[in-house]
Amino acid sequence: MDAVWEARWTMATAEECRKALETLTGRLSEMGPEDRAAHLVDRDISCRVTDLGLTFLTRLGSGGAGPVTETTGGGPPAQVRFTTKSDDLLTIAADPGSFARAWLTGRLKIEASVFDLLRLRKLL
């Protein structure tokens, strides 16, 4: 088994997941303003963590990412929706190259328009 995907004995906490999402969105600040303007459009992004029963929400745009907040739902669905387990989320945040592998192996599900998927591909 690949060491990156080695199972943990306990699932991650809500706080660890929030920090992992902040790490992922923080990578956008490393992009230059021109790249952000070219590749990012204003989109609500949600990440549902199935084993914790939580959903986190942020907003991406040419200025970067907004704060990551826990949501109880009730609002309109985000334009880009990720679904994963807590430990897989931590792995994706720790290893930038694991995003595509997680998606290809079914550990990460993505619901988005074709347009948004193409933009995500350029970022990841």
Give names to the regions the model predicted:
Residues 1-124:
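Feature captures hydrophobic
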